[in-house]
């Protein structure tokens, strides 16, 4: 079986973790290789460029090779390359950014437009280069081995891929043909392909010339119509993909309501299995991670929940407004928090308040869920409704409702935690095996 991902993003990682945890194994393949794939994840680009099984470390930001007298200026977010007063390039870090490991470098022309992007891998060498035209459209992308030899050239205007492998040139009309060549070399069983994208992975499955039992895992929202490629699968009785697993509850119900009964049978729902990193001890320690001083009803909550302790952290300096809360006995502030202190807060706190305005910081809701924090949010600040109980998302106009919930929490926290695991997108190994067990491990 092949588990085929377009990108190894958060949702792909969640699906892969859920499958492996459930004992549903396959050869995981990622099409868009960013150079930092885990060792157990395959990629045709890594294979042909001989990146698999190598040793080395990511390139640190100040190790980028430069001409004489050029310099690098950086912080924990990004870095820039300067030629005296001229900015020549911008360095983007691999997550987590505080480690300052180089992932991509945009090199500018004299008009301050990106001329090309160098892509670095987890071994510290430039494994690919993307070229842009004057309108900033991608034209070609070249992939290299460790010695800088060009191995693959992909033309984004024509779709053609040229592979130089074992002193021979191979030409492919598109990525599907390229992937099929790679699969044939690997000798994998192609009778089952599980995939989570309606782009290249869909076409790999759709154009297979022999029978198989494939599954599409749909992880996105939909608008007012079902995507065309998904409709092709649902309306056909002879494609390899006869099952669509939707991984967002609301999207599942929406899609199902738009289908005739015979097509509804092809749709199923399955969330994700999330790690369970610690037991909740019912402590009255509340954690908030923010990049803003706009925290909904913070003053009221601190005043009325005096028997709770608020731990408020930020990766940056805090404003005077937020620092003023240091005078409160039940508040501890952590400006410029270190990773060690942040990890400790996940351990010592058992409640998370998602009440800060602005962007979610560092996927904190997901991490709080994994650490079994009971999560509460206001309706105008909730950053991840898939992991928060509906009953714990409070109207921002009724702060007293949250206060009352917290004052009466001690006897129900374990029950609510159980509900948080059962009624959100969290799944169990048993349900994964029940839904997918008949399809997997071929």
Swiss-Prot record:
User: What InterPro entries does the record tag this protein with?
Assistant: GtfB (IPR014268)
Q: Which GO terms describe its cellular component?
A: plasma membrane; protein N-acetylglucosaminyltransferase complex
Instruction: Tell me, in one coarse class, where this protein mainly resides.
Output: membrane
Phenotype upon knockout? No glycosylation of serine-rich repeat protein Srr-2.
What keywords is this UniProt entry annotated with?
Cell membrane, Membrane
The pathway entry for this protein reads as: Protein modification; protein glycosylation
Q: Which GO terms describe its biological process?
A: protein O-linked glycosylation via serine; regulation of protein stability
Which domain of life does this protein belong to?
Bacteria
Q: Which family does it belong to?
A: Belongs to the GtfB family.
HAMAP family to which the protein is assigned, alphabetical? GtfB (MF_01473)
Function (record text): Required for the polymorphic O-glycosylation of the serine-rich repeat protein Srr2. A stabilizing protein that is part of the accessory SecA2/SecY2 system specifically required to export serine-rich repeat proteins, probably Srr2 in this organism. The GtfA-GtfB (Gtf1-Gtf2 in this bacteria) complex adds GlcNAc from UDP-GlcNAc to Srr2 substrate, attaching the first sugar residue. Stabilizes the glycosylation activity of GtfA in vivo.
Q: Give the multimer and partner information.
A: Interacts with glycosyltransferase GtfA (Gtf1). Interacts with glycosyltransferase GtfA; probably forms a heterotetramer with 2 subunits each of GtfA and GtfB. Part of the accessory SecA2/SecY2 protein translocation apparatus.
The protein, known as: UDP-N-acetylglucosamine--peptide N-acetylglucosaminyltransferase stabilizing protein GtfB
Species whose genome carries this gene: Streptococcus agalactiae
């Amino acid at each position: 079986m092949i588990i085929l991902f377009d990108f190894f993003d958060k949702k792909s990682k969640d699906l892969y973790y859920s499958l492996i945890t459930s004992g549903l194994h396959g050869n995981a393949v990622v099409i868009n290789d960013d150079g930092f794939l885990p060792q157990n994840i395959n990629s045709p680009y890594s294979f042909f460029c001989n990146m698999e099984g190598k040793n080395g470390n990511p390139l640190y930001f100040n190790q980028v090779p430069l001409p004489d007298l050029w310099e690098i200026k950086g912080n924990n977010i990004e870095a820039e390359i300067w030629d005296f007063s001229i900015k020549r390039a911008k360095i983007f870090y691999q997550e987590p950014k505080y480690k300052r490991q180089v992932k991509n470098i945009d090199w500018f022309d004299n008009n301050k437009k990106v001329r090309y992007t160098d892509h670095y891998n987890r071994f510290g060498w430039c494994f690919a280069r993307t070229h842009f035209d004057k309108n900033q459209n991608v034209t070609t992308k070249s992939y290299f081995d460790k010695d800088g030899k060009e191995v693959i050239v992909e033309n984004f205007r024509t779709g053609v891929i040229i592979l130089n492998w074992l002193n021979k040139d191979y030409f492919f009309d598109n990525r599907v043909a390229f992937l099929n060549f790679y699969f044939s070399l690997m000798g994998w069983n192609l009778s089952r392909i599980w995939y989570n994208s309606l782009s290249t992975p869909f076409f790999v499955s759709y154009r297979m010339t022999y029978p198989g039992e494939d599954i599409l895992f749909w992880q996105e929202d939909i608008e007012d119509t079902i995507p065309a490629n998904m409709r092709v699968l649902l309306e056909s009785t002879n494609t390899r993909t006869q099952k669509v697993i939707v991984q967002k509850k609301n999207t599942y119900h929406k899609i199902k309501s738009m289908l005739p009964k015979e097509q509804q049978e092809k749709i199923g729902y399955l969330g994700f299995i999330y790690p369970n990193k610690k037991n909740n001890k019912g402590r009255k320690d509340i954690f908030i991670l923010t990049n803003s001083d706009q925290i909904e009803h913070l003053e009221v909550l601190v005043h009325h929940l005096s028997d709770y302790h608020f731990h408020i952290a930020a990766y940056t300096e805090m404003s005077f407004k937020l620092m003023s809360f240091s005078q409160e006995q039940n508040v501890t502030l952590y400006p410029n928090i270190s990773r060690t202190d942040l990890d400790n807060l996940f351990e010592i706190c058992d409640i998370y308040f998602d009440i800060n305005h602005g962007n979610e910081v560092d996927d904190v809701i997901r991490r709080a869920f994994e650490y079994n924090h009971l999560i509460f949010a206001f309706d105008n600040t909730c950053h991840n409704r898939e992991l928060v109980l509906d009953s714990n998302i409070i109207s921002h106009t009724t702060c007293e409702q949250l206060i009352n919930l917290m004052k009466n929490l001690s006897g129900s926290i374990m029950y609510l935690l159980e509900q948080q695991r059962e009624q959100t997108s969290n799944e169990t190994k048993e349900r994964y095996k029940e839904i997918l067990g008949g399809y997997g491990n071929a």
